[in-house]
């Protein structure tokens, strides 16, 4: 990547886009079904943390989609020339709950664009901050990290990460399936082909199977975190997480956690025992 290319991308820092949405019932009901939860309507229902991803959805027309299924990079998102895109992690700070029926405003801002070099070549890291408000009351601030990378240089995407075993106090096991990923893609109007198109994911992008969405992995973590909060008599304030490697369908994964001198830590072990996601959690009393 040329120096001028990066300088042109940095001109997008500070870009702002605003959205509004009404927190209606169907996405909550459907997400409950996806996670095998019973859903019972009640007035002033609190939307679980992480489920804000079911709202404020982009709706690009078919002719606006790129070869990978993502919307072509124009407008708010910088036109990064690197072809591959992945959700790399983020931070969420929860100030006040989102309630069923609320009218919410979302303000998104390009915070940073950074060039790095990794084992696959050039990487562009894009940081976007999303702030959510009910009228003037701040409810949630999310910092989203997206990584763009070059085309694969071999037939398969490989990682040097080795399986490890850690002590844990909390655990929940999930078995992501193609049906689950299809449902989550539909719920979030996500057309990224690595999540549902097996030939594309394996032959074009070099993955071993279709890839579990980064936000869905974070949702699995939040599911366990909220159970821990109830047991410990605490309230979730923030979650910071990083996706280390892709997670694929075709094997059970373990969400695990522990509280030690450094605080509450959670992680996801993929079906091979590798730490696919690492997270830190802050609770309040």
Residue ranges of model-derived segments:
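A contiguous, surface-exposed recognition patch within enzymatic or periplasmic domains that forms
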Residues: 2-46, 160-217, 224-227
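Catalytic-pocket segment enriched in acidic/His residues
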Residues: 201-262, 269-276
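Hydrophobic, proline/glycine-rich low-complexity stretches
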Residues: 1-103
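Alpha-helix boundary/capping detector
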Residues: 79, 130, 134, 210-211
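Solvent-exposed, flexible loop/coil residues
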Residues: 13, 23, 27, 57-60, ...
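Short, surface-exposed helix-loop/turn micro-motifs enriched in polar/charged residues
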Residues: 45, 122, 233-235
